[in-house]
Design a protein with these regions (language model features):
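Metallocofactor- and cofactor-centric catalytic cores in central/energy metabolism, strongly enriched
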Residues: 1-193, 197-213, 346
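Short acidic/histidine-rich active-site segments
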Residues: 348-351
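Helix-rich catalytic cores of soluble enzyme domains
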Residues: 114-346
Length: 351
């Protein structure tokens, strides 16, 4: 949807500058823990500062700017038929569904059950017919297939039931390789897929300030094969991040910038989205509250942070604390989507 709403800016220019400077200071003085010796070696060769004793990588400001500048500010998430291509970085807000749930409300029984492969097909079919949803994020984990073939089956069924772009969360290297082989077969070859990739991958660093070797290898494989990726930190205020919203944003921004920069070190020019999935913890009851208003505020702020660097952003909205599709659900989903959309996010997932 083109932006036709007055902008919502939770951060003043002064606040925006302060958070960005603090995040860069975190990367320069504290650093990111990299759990993989080969990637420590790669980053050292690229000029990053390495502390082998605690596997920390620190980034000087000039070094960071050099590699952030290599990330494209615009690219396309292609559909298979060319009718629903998603152009990122052009000032248009796109919505996508949420992904990788493990339980679903069964409309036949009214109760919850584990998700199955048929649910991937059903949700992909639904998204294929929804004009307001620009692409399909693999919605659930199929529990009726062998774990070794989760990603292969998920992507196969998704691509079978929608012609829109398919994005999926991948958490193991073998699964990414299987998905890549499948997509190349469908595209007609490696170069055909590289030219117009109709699949993309979501990966997540570990908050606080850690990226494991598995995630780094996934980012490298995708980047080197032209597959768009997002390295989306998901810090939780009061749990895996500071209790203040500003503190959480500083940490999230540092993690997101590190993800973009490291991806460019491993795969120069890789199509990478600045990712943001910040949320909160109800510290009275130790409950994860993704549907809180603070979550929407932080995601709107994340858009401002991404646009400081002219990066397309994968943000979050459309979430709720309701347990049923009721008026609470509708209200919370509407306003979290609206707050992030009014700041011009390129892609809002969980919508």
């Amino acid at each position: 949807m083109p932006m036709g709403l007055p902008p919502y800016r939770p951060l003043s220019p002064e606040d925006l500058k302060k958070i960005d400077q603090t995040s860069r200071l975190i990367l320069e003085r504290v650093g990111i823990r990299i759990l993989g010796q080969n990637y420590l070696d790669i980053l050292k060769a690229a000029g990053a500062i390495i502390d082998q004793s605690d596997q920390k990588v620190r980034f000087e400001s000039a070094w960071l700017d050099e590699f952030l500048a290599r990330a494209p500010s615009q690219f396309v998430l292609y559909s298979r038929d060319g009718k629903n291509d998603v152009h990122l970085g052009e000032g248009v807000v796109h919505f996508a569904n949420g992904g990788r749930v493990f339980r679903i409300l069964d409309m036949g029984t009214g109760g919850y059950r584990l998700t199955m492969l048929r649910d991937v097909a059903h949700t992909a079919t639904l998204v294929n017919h929804l004009k307001n949803i620009s692409l399909y994020i693999i919605a659930c984990q199929a529990h009726d297939v062998e774990p070794h073939y989760y990603h292969l089956n998920d992507f196969y069924h998704a691509l079978n039931f929608t012609s829109k772009h398919v994005m999926g969360g991948c958490d193991d290297v073998e699964g990414v390789k299987q998905m890549l082989a499948l997509a190349q077969l469908i595209a007609g070859g490696e170069e055909e897929l590289r030219e117009k990739p109709f699949v993309s991958v979501i990966s997540n660093p570990i908050s606080p300030l850690t990226i494991d070797a598995n995630t780094l290898e996934i980012l490298t494989i995708c980047g080197s094969n032209g597959i768009p990726v997002t390295c989306a930190p998901a810090p939780i205020s009061g749990a895996t991040a500071p209790a203040t919203l500003a503190g959480t944003l500083c940490q999230m921004h540092a993690e997101a910038l590190a993800g973009v920069a490291i991806t460019q070190v491993c795969s120069p020019g890789a199509k990478v989205l600045y990712g943001a999935v910040p949320s909160t913890m109800d510290m009275r009851h130790m409950e994860y509250t993704m549907g809180s208003v603070e979550m929407a505020i932080m995601n709107a702020a994340a858009v401002q942070l991404a646009k400081l660097y002219d990066f397309p952003i994968y943000a979050s909205g459309g979430v709720t604390e309701a347990k049923r599709p009721d008026i609470q659900s509708g209200c919370e989903k509407t306003f979290s989507n609206l707050m992030v959309a009014m700041n011009g996010a390129d892609l809002i997932h969980l919508a």
